[in-house]
């Protein structure tokens, strides 16, 4: 298997001009065992375009590291210290 580090994918997403915040998690995938899902908060002036963001990512990182699923949300859940609550994101995905 290939190790994909969420931080590496997040750093690419942060370079996109329409992304104001992002978090990446691994989700169960029948074919690969795990797939990449990105939660993205867009800048106030833009709407989310998953295909455009995927194309942007493909120019920066290998295709296997590009998020399979992109979900646009209003806010990334964080604790009082500012750390992303990835357990909350996983719960949201499972629902």
What are these regions (language model features)?
Residues 1-65, 74-75, 82-92:
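AMP-binding/adenylate-forming catalytic core of the ANL superfamily
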């Amino acid at each position: 298997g290939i190790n994909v580090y969420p931080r590496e994918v997040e750093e690419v997403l942060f370079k996109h001009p329409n992304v104001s915040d992002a978090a990446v998690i691994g989700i169960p995938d029948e074919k690969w065992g795990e797939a990449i899902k990105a939660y993205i908060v867009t800048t106030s002036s833009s709407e989310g375009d998953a295909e455009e963001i995927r194309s942007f990512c493909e120019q920066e990182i290998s295709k296997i590291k590009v998020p399979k699923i992109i979900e646009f949300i209003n806010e990334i859940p964080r604790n009082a210290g500012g750390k992303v609550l990835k357990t909350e994101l996983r719960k949201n995905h499972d629902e």
